[in-house]
Design a protein with these regions (language model features):
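Thiamine diphosphate
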Residues: 1-143, 145-292
Length: 292
């Protein structure tokens, strides 16, 4: 549909689920081999020429190996480059094991001015996030999974530009903010809490550090007890973002449910349960914090 779109691959076309694109549009695909820094450099050059390049690979390889290039050659120059970091978190890195699970990427990218961060909650939302990223100017980082995550959204639901979608509105005992592929678990936890007489609001945050957090602030104002759940290190992810908004706008208690250690190899769903992301564990943490 657009002649300006380019896909830049550091030997990661399969990981990005972009093999059909490379085969159908060979003139819009550049293979750089296992050279993440080079891939970002190439993308920066293409963006300087007016094209819209997408660079994708495992999120840790992208944000750690090419950190300087993402910062200086794209962020500092505010170039129109889009990044897709796949296999994010415990739920995204099942097949390759602990060396390919990454839960620090949001902390890294959130330190770069000019970047917008998209955190889709399921494969369909990832598709719509890519479409939206192509239509906005400036650097965008999309935190993607493996394509094996639980479907929550309707497949035709657009990626919310407001940065938030409220899924459950049971009450104001607490607000549960979800981020990424734990959304189905957070919604199940909200249902469990309702059965126990604790009425919460549950929402999906799909844009971090966006330019207009007004809709997020409205939902934050529903309760003085805010909980964040994200498949990321406890530092620099959703918890840090909501804490910042609370400190700067409307103080409230923020309880962060996130990773505090490195992960381990194993089936993604079992790991998520083991590291505190089961609906039962989330609900128990809310009950404990509320003293109920």
């Amino acid at each position: 549909e657009r002649n300006d779109i380019m896909v830049i691959s550091p030997d990661s076309l399969k990981a990005m689920r972009a093999v059909p694109f490379g085969e159908k549009y060979p003139d819009h695909y550049v293979e750089c081999g296992i050279a993440e820094q080079c891939a970002v450099d190439v993308a920066a050059g293409l963006a300087s020429a007016g094209l819209t390049p997408f660079v994708g690979t495992y999120c840790g390889f992208l944000t750690m190996r090419a950190c300087e290039q993402m910062r200086t050659f794209v962020g500092y120059t505010d170039l129109n480059v889009k990044f897709v970091g796949v296999n994010a978190g415990l739920l995204g890195g099942e097949r390759e094991g602990v060396t390919h699970q990454f839960y620090e990427d949001l902390a890294i990218v959130s330190a770069f001015p000019n970047y917008t961060i998209f955190t889709p909650a399921d494969p369909a939302q990832c598709y719509h996030a890519v479409k939206l990223a192509a239509d906005i100017k400036g650097p965008v980082y999309i935190r993607a999974g493996s394509g094996r995550e639980v479907d929550v959204y309707d497949k035709n639901a657009p990626f919310a530009k407001s940065g938030i979608t409220v899924w459950k509105d049971y009450g104001s005992d607490a607000v549960l903010f979800s981020n990424g592929f734990v959304l189905d678990r957070v919604l199940a936890a909200a249902d469990l809490l309702k059965e126990q007489g604790i009425n919460v609001t549950a929402a999906d945050i799909n844009i971090l550090y966006g330019k207009d957090p007004s809709e997020i602030l409205k939902v934050m104002g529903k309760s003085q007890q805010l909980f964040t759940v994200g498949d990321h290190n406890i530092n620099g992810g959703l918890g840090s973002y909501i804490s910042r908004l609370a400190c700067e706008n409307q103080p409230a208690k923020v309880t962060r449910i996130a990773l505090t250690t490195y992960g381990e190899s194993g089936p993604a769903k079992e790991l998520a349960d083991a590291y505190g992301f089961s609906p039962e564990a989330i609900a128990a943490k809310v009950k404990e914090t509320l003293g109920k």
